[in-house]
């Protein structure tokens, strides 16, 4: 999951997004975690306003610690067009970080959904550095995948990588790299 700011102490759990209600900003609710402990509930109504972060009962001190931690992070540099070619820097706040995390988690979920749809319905493979699939062949309909994949390999003049044979996370990373045009990290 990519965000503008790299840190691992503050995360979100139980993210619920209402795409239909998202207008200017992402409409969501989530539990804010600090060092693995739930400390607050966050919500944004999706109308362009702020994200509200409210401490859970008895967690106000931890919420204050989390806010101090976020203030210690370097400012976020946004990629926006400016006349002076200077990067736009925004001081980190907890609500801004929560927005980043929610956006990144939601985008990752949507990507995972598209991947799961593709990997379940298509025979996806990498050949010559390109992501390809067999038209009209549904992966779910192949009874003996090992034999089918062996035959597919024998018909190729170059080695191929069949995504269905890889562990799910590895297949997702390769698929994502090709679909989004990302370079491997």
Predicted segment positions?
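Terminal leader/tail segments of proteins
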Residues: 1-34, 38-185
């Amino acid at each position: 999951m990519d965000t503008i700011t790299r840190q691992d102490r503050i995360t979100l759990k139980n993210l619920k997004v209402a795409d239909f209600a998202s207008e200017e900003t992402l409409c969501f609710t989530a539990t804010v975690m600090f060092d693995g402990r739930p400390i607050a509930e966050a919500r944004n109504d999706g109308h362009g306003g702020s994200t509200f972060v409210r401490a859970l009962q008895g967690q106000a001190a931890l919420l204050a610690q989390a806010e101090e931690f976020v203030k210690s992070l370097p400012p976020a540099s946004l990629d926006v067009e400016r006349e002076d070619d200077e990067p736009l820097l925004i001081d980190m706040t907890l609500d801004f970080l929560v927005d980043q995390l929610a956006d990144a988690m939601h985008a990752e979920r949507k990507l995972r959904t598209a991947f799961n749809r593709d990997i379940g319905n298509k025979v996806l493979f990498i050949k010559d550095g390109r992501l390809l699939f067999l038209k009209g062949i549904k992966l779910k309909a192949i009874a003996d995948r090992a034999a089918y994949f062996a035959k597919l390999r024998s018909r190729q003049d170059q080695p191929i990588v069949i995504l269905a044979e890889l562990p799910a996370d590895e297949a997702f990373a390769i698929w994502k790299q090709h679909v989004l045009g990302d370079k491997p990290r």
